[in-house]
């Protein structure tokens, strides 16, 4: 860490290598009527050249109410009250994460459907022009309101310094998001979403969830007991 008064930027955090191979962990909550579900992997850093395309991808996949994963798990299958995905952009590579809470008996099915959506947006059902247009609009429509207060402006300036971004990053946000093409969304989905290497963490009842996960073809879960 730089000494006090030293205005040199702090060194970037060490890059964490991606984990190869899918893994499942169940944190024991015996008798739980619901499971807390997280599925994720390493994503991208804030300065990544694909930042804007990844925002659009996330909006299509799980970043808004009408996104694919929420429509599947909530609207079609009624497994949950809501499901969402996020890319957590940091100085180093932050996580990509799906999060939701589902009924215990449908936990494995919810995991299965989530992975199907990951695979579909990569290959069999890439983002459509209509989905991409809606995603771009959701990201840009209210963007000017992010700078209405002094606190918001200070926070924005802090981001420029923290992530070492160009001074015109926020001015360029809307045009760069609007320039994201359907093909770019497919490209970044194939590049940054790697379902075979994703980690699944479930907080729930292992007696119900573990055999159901294995019946769906997932690897045998690691059972984690928290005192």
Q: Where on the chain are the PLM-derived regions?
A:
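Small-residue-rich helix-loop
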Residues: 133-140, 144
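Structural motif
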Residues: 202-205
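Non-catalytic beta-strand/loop surface segments
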Residues: 3-48, 59-110, 131, 152-156, ...
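Acidic/histidine-rich, surface-exposed loop or edge segments in extracytoplasmic proteins
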Residues: 37, 167-170
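Divalent metal-coordination and catalytic microenvironments
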Residues: 39, 55, 73, 114, ...
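PAPS/PAP-binding and catalytic site of the sulfotransferase fold
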Residues: 1, 114-115
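Hard-cation-handling environments
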Residues: 149
């Amino acid at each position: 860490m730089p000494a006090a008064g030293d205005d040199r930027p702090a060194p970037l955090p060490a890059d964490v290598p991606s984990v190869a191979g899918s893994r499942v962990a169940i944190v024991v909550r015996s008798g739980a009527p619901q499971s807390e579900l997280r599925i994720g992997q390493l994503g991208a850093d804030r300065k990544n050249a694909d930042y804007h395309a990844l925002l659009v991808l996330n909006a299509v996949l799980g970043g808004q109410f009408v996104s694919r994963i929420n429509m599947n798990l909530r609207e079609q299958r009624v497994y949950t009250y809501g499901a969402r995905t996020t890319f957590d952009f940091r100085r180093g590579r932050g996580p990509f994460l799906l999060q939701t809470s589902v009924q215990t008996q449908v936990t494995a099915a919810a995991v299965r459907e989530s992975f199907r959506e990951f695979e579909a947006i990569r290959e069999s059902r890439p983002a459509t022009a209509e989905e991409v247009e809606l995603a771009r609009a959701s990201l840009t429509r209210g963007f000017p309101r992010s700078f209405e207060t002094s606190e918001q402006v200070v926070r924005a300036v802090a981001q420029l310094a923290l992530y070492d971004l160009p001074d015109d990053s926020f001015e360029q946000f809307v045009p760069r998001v609007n320039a994201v093409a359907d093909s770019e969304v497919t490209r970044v989905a194939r590049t940054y979403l790697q379902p075979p290497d994703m980690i699944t963490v479930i907080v729930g009842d292992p007696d119900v969830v573990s055999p159901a996960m294995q019946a769906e073809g997932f690897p045998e879960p690691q059972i984690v007991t928290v005192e």
